[in-house]
């Protein structure tokens, strides 16, 4: 499967995924994922986390390429209040539904008969960042054979989870890391679908005698569709109204001076989202053209652009 999302063990360490619960609170079923203890705290073996996280990326990319639907379920209100800006990004994409309210029992197993307002699409997969607060979701998805993906901490029971990922489920950093992986895999799945015909056309290039010409042909088409993919997704963000929300009104106010204080304290999390999604792939000439078309005047645009890359 073609995938351009790369993660490293250093990113897992920076996200505090190696930390577990106190040694007094642990589940023997997670003993396989533990490497030891340090200061009465269980420590996860990041080799398993790294291997399963890469499989998680491939699974997500295949899910989105085949037009699947994903539910993000989180009942941990403490994490939701601290990271509420994260979830505004997922309201833009029809492939993802985020559920942050209290889980109604029978939402999956009795989907037809639940009388509350339900999401429009039934899920093909479910992502649960914390099993302790969402064990009803895991049990219902296990009953009706929907693949569930969950971050399994040292106190959790991974027996009913279809795709367990060992790690720290009580940290905001680990939650932010996995949500950024989901956002990146969604963007790259759109890139895969837009350039699918390239892989079909490679088999038709056997008539070319030289391998050099064949490689140049494929490389040029990849570059062309990479620019097209970026342009389509950036225009999608503008059309969907993501930049027209209150926290992004500074982009639409003419000749407004942007200071470091307003960016770092009011719009830090949305800038982190955009910078992580478009890092190393965003061409600022395309961004500037869209800004000029929308007649957006930002006085300190260079500071805004550098901050997007420096924050992560």
Curated annotation (Swiss-Prot):
InterPro entries: Ribosomal_uS2, Ribosomal_uS2_bac/mit/plastid, Ribosomal_uS2_CS, Ribosomal_uS2_flav_dom_sf
Membrane-spanning parts: none
Pfam families tied to this protein: Ribosomal_S2
Keywords assigned by UniProt, alphabetized: Mitochondrion, Ribonucleoprotein, Ribosomal protein
Localization annotation: Mitochondrion
Cellular component per GO, a single term: mitochondrial small ribosomal subunit
GO MF annotation, one: structural constituent of ribosome
SUPFAM superfamilies per UniProt: Ribosomal protein S2
Domain of life: Eukaryota
Any one Gene Ontology BP term: translation
Cystines in this chain: none
Family: Belongs to the universal ribosomal protein uS2 family.
Protein name: Small ribosomal subunit protein uS2m
């Amino acid at each position: 499967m073609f995938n351009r999302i790369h993660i490293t063990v250093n990113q897992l360490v920076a996200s505090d995924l190696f930390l577990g619960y106190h040694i007094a609170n642990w589940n023997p079923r997670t003993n396989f994922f533990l490497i030891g203890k340090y200061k009465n705290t269980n420590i996860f073996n990041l080799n398993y986390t790294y291997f399963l996280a890469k499989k998680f990326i491939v699974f997500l990319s295949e899910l989105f390429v085949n037009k699947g639907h994903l539910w993000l379920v989180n009942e941990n209100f403490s994490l939701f209040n601290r990271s509420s800006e994260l979830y505004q990004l997922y309201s833009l994409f029809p492939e993802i539904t985020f559920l942050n309210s209290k889980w109604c029992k029978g939402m999956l197993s009795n989907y037809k008969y639940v009388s509350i307002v339900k999401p429009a699409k039934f899920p093909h997969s479910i992502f649960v960042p914390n099993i302790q607060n969402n064990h009803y979701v895991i049990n219902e998805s296990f009953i009706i054979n929907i693949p569930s993906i969950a971050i399994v901490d040292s106190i959790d029971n991974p027996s009913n989870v279809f795709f367990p990922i060992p790690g720290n489920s009580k940290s905001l950093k680990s939650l932010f890391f996995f949500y950024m992986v989901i956002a990146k895999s969604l963007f790259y799945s759109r890139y895969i679908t837009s350039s699918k015909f390239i892989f079909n056309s490679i088999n038709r290039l056997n008539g070319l005698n030289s391998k050099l010409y064949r490689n140049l042909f494929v490389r040029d088409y990849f570059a062309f569709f990479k620019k097209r993919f970026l342009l389509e997704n950036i225009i999608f963000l503008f059309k969907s109204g993501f930049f027209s929300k209150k926290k992004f009104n500074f982009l639409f106010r003419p000749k407004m001076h942007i200071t470091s204080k307003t960016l770092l304290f009011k719009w830090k999390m949305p800038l982190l989202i955009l910078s992580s999604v478009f890092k190393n792939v965003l061409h600022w000439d395309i961004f500037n053209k869209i800004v000029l078309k929308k007649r957006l005047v930002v006085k300190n645009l260079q500071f805004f652009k550098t901050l997007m890359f420096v924050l992560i």
